[in-house]
Swiss-Prot record:
Reactions catalysed: Hydrolysis of (1->6)-alpha-D-glucosidic linkages to branches with degrees of polymerization of three or four glucose residues in limit dextrin
Keywords: Carbohydrate metabolism, Glycogen metabolism, Glycosidase, Hydrolase
Task of the protein: Removes maltotriose and maltotetraose chains that are attached by 1,6-alpha-linkage to the limit dextrin main chain, generating a debranched limit dextrin.
A single GO molecular function term of this UniProt record: glycogen debranching enzyme activity
Gene3D superfamilies: Glycosidases (3.20.20.80), Golgi alpha-mannosidase II (2.60.40.1180), Immunoglobulins (2.60.40.10)
Organism: Shigella dysenteriae serotype 1 (strain Sd197)
Stretches the record annotates as Disordered: 460-479
Active site, UniProt feature: D336 (nucleophile), E371 (proton donor)
Protein name (record): Glycogen debranching enzyme
Length: 657
């Protein structure tokens, strides 16, 4: 039987060098680590890792080849009160594995025990890691490096984006390969998108609770192997990495960046009653934030929280991010519940992971976007991330909805959000692009549902409609649900146009939710994380071509306005912006706070957004000059010069002179 050589303590994971495979695993509290390899018949061969350098266990298996399936058994104390839950009866996933073979089913053997260990062996049913080859011909691929000021983000789900697309071959719909199909790329280009932001693509598992209800985790925010691609999005699990790289290479050739939504805040092992897949059995005490009683700090709402202040966990997270950039050429990350990244346990801008990213020559050069909160005390950190990070701007989301759908936001507050929320983000040398402006995202109502539903309708999620937020700032315009009279449909359309215009012509970085540009509805479900069906898949056959054209025209208009693309804070008198009332005069203090919802925003001295957010048709006197409405508010031919705009109720128009 082949013996393991000592091997090397770096890099983490399993790496083939042409002659064999080097295996490394971190565990500060293990007493012994066994590498378990499986032949084609499923027979297991165990080897003690002979190398032990600091807290890294390592060994080298000569003659091992790519395709080898493996896992670990980690020996150590079972002391739950101290945070130790070692159980060598359970086969564990390598945290740095790049491919997984098998499914994460709800099986009693995949649990380690709560107070007492479960010593039933689970190797027969446990998922296995697979050694992969890193080689790929990137040809002349280069990152687009779109300037922040020119960036338009499109948030999409790999499967949901293309699964029902009639012009994409059936056999690749809903896959990584479909992302790089010419039909999809041409659509994104025509729309004006510069960055495709994908919901999680790292291997994830469906929560046991969902499996028991016949549901699955659709969004993917339940990670189990952060270096491995989710195989369900591949035409073949064995070619997932190749397919993903092909898609990125094709998108890059079209000038489109790829941003990954990544989950570094918790794992699919959930709470102490959850399954045992990897980290809990490798070194529970190091990987997670542990309370004094041995339970987890649940700052994520998912049962556990990764301890991203521990040096080894910082190294793990940093290596993961570098892997996606260096090996897959991704252009950036959106970090889920990113306040966890800064916990020490209190939130700090100089937290270890932030510092590691700042000092990394690779990670400091890509786009970094934070979801700037978690659910723990002090978890709301909007505006407080380090300068390299942009942040989801929920202030903008709520303000846009309140202004156009609830009619209860003063002009001053609206203008502040329109101007990249400078009161929040203009600090520490940050630029307006730090504000990621959004009206909708994957969680919450779609744009169409914002104007069709006053209340969430999440019954299909199996929680009796308790899940999902109740603070939607939506307006059904008089009737709950889709459909209605022609007048109702037109009023809803006008509200959608107003919200899209506010999003795409405001200062900051706009993010558009995939499907909003053609009227996708989730029928009032504002938490469709477990709906892998036609509720969430984009139905391209029902897409509104008129709304898509309207959205594309707005995006292309944005790119023509220097005040929006130059990424500089607006200052009084700099020619970037002037705020005027309905008579084309500067607003008084009283008008800002208590005046009617009528406003003119003059950008770059030649583009004018005229707003009438009142209930009545209102005459708006435009500033001096020859103004004409421009697409998408008027045709390009035979522009009509006007000095006064008859603003419809809850309407707006864009002019140029």
């Amino acid at each position: 039987m082949t013996q393991l050589a000592i091997g090397k303590p770096a890099p983490l994971g399993a790496h083939y060098d042409g002659q064999g495979v080097n295996f490394t695993l971190f565990s500060a509290h293990a007493e012994r680590v066994e590498l378990c390899v499986f032949d084609a018949n499923g027979h297991e061969h165990r080897y003690d890792l002979p190398g032990h350098s600091g807290d890294i266990w390592h060994g080298y298996l000569p003659d091992a080849r790519p395709g080898l399936r493996y896992g670990y058994r980690v020996h150590g104390p079972w002391q739950p009160a101290e945070g130790h839950r070692f159980n060598p009866a359970k086969l564990l996933i390598d945290p740095c594995a790049r491919q997984i073979d098998g499914e994460f089913k709800d099986n009693p053997l995949l649990y380690a025990g709560h107070n007492e260990p479960d010593y039933r062996d689970n190797a027969a049913i446990a998922p296995k890691c697979v050694v992969v080859v890193d080689h790929y011909d990137w040809e002349d691929d280069a990152p687009p490096r779109t300037p922040w000021g020119s960036t338009i983000i499109y948030e999409a789900h790999v499967k949901g984006l293309t699964y029902l697309h009639p012009e994409i071959p059936v056999e690749i719909r809903g896959t990584y390969k479909a992302l790089g199909h010419p039909v999809m790329i041409n659509y994104l280009k025509q729309l004006g998108i510069t960055a495709l932001e994908l919901l999680p693509v790292a291997q994830f598992a469906s929560e046991p609770r969902l499996q028991r209800m016949g549901l699955s985790n659709y969004w993917g925010y339940n990670p189990v192997a952060m270096f491995a691609l989710h195989p369900a999005y591949a035409c073949s699990p064995e070619t997932a990495l190749h397919e993903f790289r092909d898609a990125i290479k094709a998108l890059h050739k079209a000038g489109i960046e790829v941003i990954l939504d990544i989950v570094l805040n918790h794992s699919a092992e959930l709470d102490l009653d959850g399954p045992l897949f990897s980290l809990r059995g490798i070194d529970n005490r190091s990987y997670y934030w542990i309370r004094e009683d041995g339970d987890y700090h649940n700052w994520t709402g998912c049962g556990n929280t990764l301890n991203l202040s521990h040096p080894a966990v910082v190294d793990y997270a940093s290596a993961c991010l570098r892997y996606w950039v260096e090996t897959c050429h991704v252009d950036g990350f959106r970090f889920d519940l990113a306040a966890v990244m800064g916990r020490t346990p209190e939130f700090r801008q100089d937290a270890p992971l932030f510092t590691a990213i700042q000092n990394c020559p690779v990670l400091s050069q890509v786009k970094l976007i934070a979801e700037p909160w978690d659910i723990a005390p002090g978890g709301y950190q909007v505006g407080n991330f380090p300068p390299l990070f942009a942040e989801w701007n929920d202030h903008f989301r709520d303000a846009a909805r309140r202004f156009w759908l609830h009619y209860d936001l003063p002009l001053g507050a609206f203008a502040g959000r329109f101007a990249a929320s400078s009161d929040v983000f203009k600090r520490n040398g940050r630029l307006p692009s730090a504000a990621i402006n959004l009206v909708t995202a994957h969680d919450g109502f779609t744009l169409r549902d914002c104007v069709c539903f006053n209340h969430k309708h999440n019954e299909a999620n199996g929680e009796e409609n308790r899940d999902g937020t109740n603070n939607n700032y939506s307006n059904n315009h008089g009737k709950e649900g889709l459909g209605g009279t022609l007048d109702l449909v037109e009023r809803r359309r006008d509200s959608i146009h107003a919200l899209l215009t506010t999003l795409l012509l405001s200062q900051g970085t706009p993010m558009l939710l995939a499907g909003d540009e053609h009227g996708h509805s989730q029928h009032g479900n504002n938490n469709a994380y477990c709906q892998d069906n036609q509720l969430t898949w984009l139905d391209w056959s029902q897409a509104s071509s008129g709304l898509t054209a309207f959205t594309a025209a707005l995006i292309h208009l944005r790119k023509r306005i220097p005040a929006l693309v130059e990424n500089r804070w607006w200052e009084e008198g700099d020619g970037n912006v002037r705020w005027l009332n309905r008579y084309a005069q500067p607003l008084s203090t009283d008008e800002w706070q208590n005046g009617p919802k009528q406003l003119q925003i003059l950008l770059s001295d030649r583009f004018l957004i005229a707003i009438n957010a009142t209930l009545e048709v209102t005459e708006i006197v435009l500033p001096a000059g020859e103004w004409h409405a421009i697409p998408p508010f008027a045709g390009e031919d035979n522009p009509v010069i006007t000095a006064v705009w008859q603003g419809p109720a809850h309407g707006l128009c864009v002019f140029q002179r």
